[in-house]
UniProtKB/Swiss-Prot annotation:
Residues 115-144 have a biased composition (Low complexity). Residues 346-359 have a biased composition (Polar residues). It comes from Bos taurus (Bovine). Residues 401-472 are annotated as: Interaction with SUZ12. This is Zinc finger protein AEBP2. Acts as an accessory subunit for the core Polycomb repressive complex 2 (PRC2), which mediates histone H3K27 (H3K27me3) trimethylation on chromatin leading to transcriptional repression of the affected target gene. Plays a role in nucleosome localization of the PRC2 complex. The lineage of its organism: Eukaryota, Metazoa, Chordata, Craniata, Vertebrata. GO terms for cellular component: ESC/E(Z) complex. It is found in: Nucleus. Residues 489-511 are annotated as: Important for nucleosome binding activity of the PRC2 complex. Residues 146-157 have a biased composition (Basic and acidic residues). It comes from the Eukaryota. Residues 59-71, 160-169, 179-190 have a biased composition (Gly residues). Self-associates. Associates with the PRC2 complex, which consists of the core components EED, EZH1 or EZH2, SUZ12, and RBBP4, and various combinations of accessory subunits including AEBP2, JARID2, PHF19, MTF2 and EPOP. Found in a monomeric PRC2.2 (class 2) complex consisting of at least SUZ12, RBBP4, AEBP2 and JARID2. Within the PRC2 complex, interacts directly with SUZ12; competes with PHF19 for SUZ12 binding. Interacts with EED, EZH2, and RBBP4. May also interact with RBBP7. The modification N-acetylalanine is found at residue 2.
Length: 511
């Protein structure tokens, strides 16, 4: 046993001083030693077994444990914790190898079973008799303490898949090109150094080692938690340590004075309004007041009213000093007129709530277009409704009939003029004889004062006894003498009503 420990120390020192060839594992892959009783009983058999195994491993490119000086190291009984975690494609081979290892340990050193477990095992860890061997492409991990204590060999990461002739990563963190990449979850994906330092492993909360996939899942879940924390606006520890800072949602709004040659800036609208009122409005003298606000539509337009300028500047400052006096209402207005229009709405709402328990929302706050539409519908409905009082009674009908008869007797519109012409009758009021011997007669037309008197020959007297003239050809100034309703200036509705009445009177006169 002492000789075996001495050889182990010599091999470790040689591995430190001389570089190892690719594919050969360092002494960090050694396992636990068996008890002295087993070593003495099977010393000779295991020496031959170790030499055969070492030759097979070196010829096959696999990383076997360092065996030298003819001294063999005993193989420890495998424990559940000493089995390295393999990739997903090597699960079946790992189960078979574990069964073979159990048989070899229980059989007391059978050469064939131990050789198969050393050469064909796909689990991590380089070994001779003392440690379990790594298959080609696997990463070895250190387990030796250097003082003969039993050290548990645990994997640092998942092995690469077995490839033909590819060496695993050695104890000096050398990764061969024949196998897949070996990832270490603890210290950057390499095995422990040859100095016997124990590789760091990621341990779960219950003490079990984490595989590569478990570690990656935990890392990805941590990253997702951080992303969700940042997106939701919560402060992360990194932010609290100064690596990040949360910005406040509220921003200070600056109110700048845009008056010509004024660079004042305020933090609130009332302060800006006081500044404009005291400096720019009240400071103007001479009876002429102008607004010098940049971009104003009445820029530099003179006015004689200072109160107008004060009200106008409220549109620039945004201040609304006129607040509603009704309790519970927070409305404010830029002008007193707006406040005066707002206050009655509170009382109208109270009255409407008494009349109707469910007032319409549109009536409480109607738009201008809605008001005009309702007004038109209301007026249309009012015109269509029948009138409650009708003053066209029998007495009125008799008076209209009398006036129609008198008008017809004087103008003969209905009897001779067919309803649209006036019939004039002539009478001789004078007679004269000219120098040529002709006799002239002066005719006077009835109804009077409509047509002027005219001189005609005596031979034309018979033809001019009557004269029919259309109403449209009568002079307007004299046509009103027939009846005041002719050419009377009145609204269109009353004119239409009058014409209907005239037609009705004429119809009655025919009866």
């Amino acid at each position: 046993m002492a000789a075996a420990l001495t050889d182990m120390a010599d091999l470790e020192e040689l591995s430190r001083l001389s570089p190892l060839p690719p594919g050969s594992p360092g002494p960090a892959a050694r396992g636990r030693a068996e008890p002295p009783e087993e070593e003495e009983e099977e010393d000779e058999e295991e020496e031959a077994e170790a030499e055969a195994v070492a030759a097979l491993l070196l010829n096959g490119g696999g990383g076997g444990g360092g065996v030298g000086g003819g001294e063999a190291e005993t193989m420890s009984e495998p424990s559940p914790e000493s089995a390295s975690q393999a990739g997903e494609d090597d699960d079946e081979e790992e189960d078979d190898d574990e069964e073979e290892e159990d048989e070899s340990s229980s059989g007391g050193g059978e050469e064939e079973s131990s050789a198969e477990s050393l050469v064909g095992s796909s689990s991590g860890g380089s070994s001779s008799d003392e440690t379990r061997s790594l298959s080609p492409g696997a990463a070895s991990s250190s387990s030796g303490d250097g003082d003969g204590k039993e050290g548990l060999e645990e994997p640092k990461g998942p092995r690469g898949s077995q490839g033909g002739g590819g060496g695993g990563s050695s104890s000096s963190s050398v990764v061969s090109s024949g196998g897949d990449e070996g990832y270490g979850t603890g210290g950057g994906g390499s095995s422990a150094t040859s100095g016997g330092r124990r590789g760091s492993l990621e341990m779960s909360s219950d003490g079990e080692p984490l595989s590569r996939m478990d570690s990656e899942d935990s890392i990805s879940s941590t990253i997702m938690d951080v992303d969700s924390t940042i997106s939701s606006g919560r402060s992360t520890p990194a932010m609290m340590n100064g690596q990040g800072s949360t910005t406040s949602s509220s921003k200070n709004i600056a109110y700048n004075c845009c008056w010509d040659q004024c660079q004042a800036c305020f933090t609130s609208s009332p302060d800006l309004a006081d500044h404009i009122r005291s400096i720019h409005v009240d400071g103007q003298r001479g009876g002429v007041f102008v607004c010098l606000w940049k971009g104003c539509k009445v820029y530099n337009t003179p006015s004689t009213s200072q109160s107008w300028l004060q009200r106008h500047m409220l549109t620039h400052s945004g201040d609304k000093p006129f607040k509603c006096v009704v309790g519970g209402c927070n409305a404010s207005f830029a002008s007193q007129g707006g406040l005066a229009r707002h206050v009655p709405t509170h009382f109208s709402q109270q009255n409407s709530s008494k009349v109707s328990s469910q007032p319409k929302a549109k009536e409480e706050s109607p738009s201008k277009a809605g008001m005009n539409k309702r007004r038109k519908l209301k007026n249309k409905r009012r015109r269509s409704l029948p009138r409650p009082h009708d003053f066209f009674d029998a007495q009125t009908l008799d008076a209209i009939r009398h006036r129609a008869i008198c008008f017809n007797l004087s103008a003969h519109i209905e009897s001779l003029g067919k309803g649209h012409s006036v019939v004039f009758h002539s009478t001789v009021i004078a007679k004269r004889k000219e120098d040529s011997g002709k006799i002239k007669l002066l005719l006077h037309w009835m109804p009077e004062d409509i047509l002027p008197d005219v001189w005609v020959n005596e031979s034309e007297r018979h033809q001019l006894k009557t004269k029919v003239v259309h109403l449209s050809k009568l002079p307007k100034d004299t046509a009103l003498l027939l009846d005041p309703n002719i050419y009377r200036t009145m609204p269109q509705k009353r004119l239409k009503r009058t014409l209907i009445r005239k037609v009705f009177n004429l119809y009655l006169s025919k009866q």
